[in-house]
């Protein structure tokens, strides 16, 4: 008799995705981050759902409702800090996942890659709107500064900003709609994740060598289910440690002051995972130019498959490209540091240099290096 998991209309979809899925036998731990992102998303939706039961999206009570969650709700502080630090874990896994894709040439699966970029934008939008909800000083001023960037769009900019605000400043209407969108977007992200997996399973997984692995496949279960569970345990241990020992390590002290439109904080900055993009934005003295650079800092990933000039897919056997890749990582870490610093010498010039280098590596140096490597191998 055929197993029910192979015949049942619903179960056979799950079976072909997580049980009998043919998977390359050589996948390293860098392939764990996809499933870790799934766990992060589940944790965020669950904790977010329980937080939404106690939160009130009103400028008069939002800050107090978050305080109430932390002080009066049973284990409310765990929910709140799991959600806040869960977002940090989400972005750590997200950036490592994208980095893996760049290093091993996974971007040649263009549909999967482009859905991934769409997912990155959706998660960033969700995180930004979530940061506004506690209605602290950094929530309010972060929302004001970032939404104001849209006013740089020619002709329609000012009207667009007022339309998003629901008035002439960030106020009650803005908070209410941000809460609505923050609640809705994770479910859209979940749907996009399914499309992402659908396209991935059309082609099968890439592997560290970048060589087709059709002759050497193993079933996903039990090999990679066990491997993924180890990843889950490591990540959840790290998250729990962060939540239970230093929950405010990655937050901003300014957000413990209720929002005050009459008092601007000395340094307005987003959460750490947006600092690299914020540094790129600030490195251009023109408003519209800065906004374009900000969008392109992520959108540039969409051009990467077009600029793949190497005869090899993965960087595993390409030492020159590897050096460039790690230079790119160092550049991003530098940008993250600069994004948290005040706008003064020498931070401005370091930020501008790192921004130029970031785009240079991805758009010019990597394709040229690949051509040089092809020549060295007489290909």
From Swiss-Prot:
The protein's name: Cytochrome b
Cellular component aspect of the GO annotation: mitochondrial inner membrane; respiratory chain complex III
Miscellaneous field: Heme 1 (or BL or b562) is low-potential and absorbs at about 562 nm, and heme 2 (or BH or b566) is high-potential and absorbs at about 566 nm.
InterPro entries associated with the record: Cyt_b/b6_C, Cyt_b/b6_C_sf, Cyt_b/b6_N, Cytb/b6-like_sf, Cytochrome_b, Cytochrome_b_C_euk/bac, Cytochrome_b_N_euk/bac, Di-haem_cyt_TM
Coiled-coil residues: none
Binding residues annotated for a ubiquinone, in chain numbering: 201
Species: Lonchophylla chocoana
Residues holding heme b b566: 97, 196
PANTHER family tied to this protein: CYTOCHROME B
GO biological process: mitochondrial electron transport, ubiquinol to cytochrome c
Entry keyword set: Electron transport, Heme, Iron, Membrane, Metal-binding, Mitochondrion, Mitochondrion inner membrane, Respiratory chain, Transmembrane, Transmembrane helix, Transport, Ubiquinone
Gene that this sequence comes from: MT-CYB
